[in-house]
Amino acid sequence: ANKKKSQPAEVEVQAKSYQKQLNEEIAKDRELHEKKPLKNKDNDDDQTPTPPATKRISQSKTDPECGLFHKGEHEKQFAYVANTACDRHNFILDFVLGAGNIHDSIMFSGLFEKVLKKFPEMQATAVDAGYKTPAIMKQIIESGRVPCVPYKRPMTKDGFFKKYDFVYDEYFDCVLCPNNQPLAYSTTNRDGYREYKSNAKICKDCPMRSQCTESKACQKIVNRHIWEPYMELAEDYRHTPEYRDIYKLRSETIERVFADAKEKHAMRY
């Protein structure tokens, strides 16, 4: 569809497949830390049902079901995306189609369940960095399979400490900063992240503050997902030669599938 023939549209935000389970675990985590339960957005005092959350998108006039796909920083096009799974011999096992504005990680769950049902003998799953999320790592590991993932570059500013510079202390449930000062637990938010906050009085005179935070309150906040242990386990697998070699097979398997689709079946735009 022509990307110039579009119109603004208000659409309902689709709930994530794991949202119910995440909400339950957030409630348990808050109770464990003696925090009040989060208010349910659907329960108001006047008992009036809350309308579903919506978002504003650019919708194609020609094909309203497709989505605006962003390729890189400047290129975009109305399109569909195909999330595809194949085996080590390059045979396609299954796929799911979705609008171009749906992130790959959202579509993964349905595809993984379909492949798992057809091929229960599967032992490992190689995915790229776009699928490296706590929910996906949890789903793969709890199914008894091994996730084979790549290194993912820290999303922090140049010159600032990376997330791995802040070490989590499981025994005391706190985070230690590069200056060996503790960041105490503060709360667990709706997205499933525990927030750890530093002592502003200590940070104010810290010699490393310019590399740590630009906060006017002189306070560093580090987020840690309640499913972070699954991410850490995936990192352990990443350093294992057996699973590192499995990930390297992507270049000659699924990448070949995409190359054939683009070159031989006119799927390149």
Name each model-derived stretch.
Residues A1-Y269:
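Anion-binding and metal-coordination hotspots
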